[in-house]
Amino acid sequence: MTESERCKMPNMTIKDIARISGCSVSTISRVINDRPDVRPETKEHILQIMRESGFVPNTNARQLKIQQSRSLVFVVKGTRNLFFSDFLVQLQRAATLYGYSGIVSYLDENANEIDAAEKILREIKPKGMIFLGGSVTNFQKGFANITVPSVLATLVSDELDFPNLSMVGVDDRASAHTAVAHLIAQGHQKIAVLGGPATSFPSRMRRLGAQDAMEDAGLRFDDTLYGLSNYDFESAYHAMNGLLAKRAEFTALFAMSDVIAVGAIRALVSAGLRVPEDVSVIGFDGITMSRYCVPVITTIVQPSEQIALQSVELLVRQIEHGAPAQTVTLQPELQPGESVRPCRGNF
């Protein structure tokens, strides 16, 4: 396409830039946000196309004027979930790139997200909804009443099947298997686990993944080494203290979130134990805080930017083109830190 042809294209979008450049939407997003993980020649190629086409990200006056008619609602279940806090930044950015504004609705962990969504639909009338977290049971019972295109982000379940509900996330069971297998590879056999109850789908899948890894290694999953914790610092701190009070013997801990890992590490240190010298700890999520803890937490990183972009892209396709719902499972990454070391025996 020549420069003159590009200049004739009105209302260019990020999808147009991706198509013309031959790059992915996520790559265009990284260039717009001046991310360093783009090759210089690719970045210059994309910027040249933007200059020639007169493309400007959708933060101009025209976009603000139509913002109300192009709104999405992000229903966040869990006010203290730091992964969701990090993820929301990516989600808002992705929505803006596609020309939509995001309205955030925070709910307590025990709230019914479907009831809240029905109320939002009556009051705001958004074009679509993205749920961050949720109860599979609540969706099974009430999602049929949600009439707008929707996406369940960070959770993928084969127990849900609705024509207007896409899902984007990682395989929680396989990801937990990776985490615990990493501990086992370091020689750990007595592994404690901190996570939520079986009524929580992610917690249930992550527990099964931990069990799978231990069984694959010929080890027994010890139910007495499982501590119930919400996904917040205080709950994790008390859950770890509960395990320590029972004089449970373990050399490693799989925490079902980085927040749980931080709370647990604080309890271990308060009890006079060292991480990782006495107890190795691996987390889950890859939140920013995990990289600034002492020690740096070894964790399973959920690709939050990819999840956000895929979630918004699927939602926009449903809204603008009537596309069918899809399920997208993305691959997490084991990010080594300083909180895991080879086993040296029980503490």
Task: Name these PLM-found stretches.
Residues 125-133, 192-194, 226, 247-257, ...:
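Periplasmic-binding protein-like
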Residues 1-67:
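N-terminal helix-turn-helix DNA-binding module of bacterial transcription factors
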Residues 189-190, 221-225, 275-280:
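Short acidic capping loops at alpha-helix termini that bridge into adjacent secondary structure
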Residues 239-347:
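Flexible loop/turn connectors
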Residues 77-86, 104-113, 155, 167-178, ...:
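Hinge/beta->alpha junction and helix N-cap segments in small-molecule ligand-binding domains
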Residues 24, 70, 127, 188-190, ...:
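Short acidic/polar active-site loop segments enriched in Thr and Asp
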Residues 1-9, 67-181, 245:
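Alpha-helical recognition/docking segments in bacterial nutrient-uptake
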